[in-house]
Amino acid sequence: AEQTLRTKSVVVAAGAWLPRLVGQHVSLRPLHAVRAQPSHFAPRPGFDDIEMWPTFIHRGLSAQPEVENSWYGLWTPGEGVKVGSHLVHDELDLDNRSFEINRKFESALQEYVAQWYPGLDADKVTSTTCIYTNEPNEHFILDRKGPLTVCSPCSGHGFKYVPAIGKITADLAMGGTQSVKEWQF
């Protein structure tokens, strides 16, 4: 149903679609959206304390030399340990997004897991795709212009800071100002 809602302010947190939605109202830094492909790996039998799995960021080489990388991982209840890449992604066309799994990259993740994480079964993998958005300096865009608050924590990078980002965004929406220059428009 169509409805008109009038408010004193609005928050737009639209990820890769942010330039299309607010680009005519504010001057944004460029955003680059790519197709990321994290995978979930099952624990090996006998690895009973999987819920205690630490979140990690690992800068290093995979078993495939052309894939120098920064890897991340975290326990996801019901799915296993999520492992992904911060640096290696496929280019993305937002209007024609593919959900097809890149088997070469999945293989690189499997080899990495087999090399570094003996508690995980590299053969028991479930991969998915998602959109990963960044700006050139990997900073956030959290700012306000008039009644418009823009929140772009830039995908996985911002996920680590959700409580702080939420607090800052709420403050901006209520009339606060942004003092961190790197996060301004």
Locate predicted features:
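C-terminal catalytic lobe of FAD-dependent flavoproteins
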Residues: 114-185
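Alpha-helix N-cap/helix-start capping motif
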Residues: 15-16, 163
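Active-site substrate-recognition segment that forms the wall
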Residues: 4, 9, 16-146
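A conserved short coil-to-beta-strand element within the FAD-binding core of flavoproteins
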Residues: 1
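Glycine-rich, N-terminal phosphate-binding loop of Rossmann-like dinucleotide-binding domains
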Residues: 14-15, 152
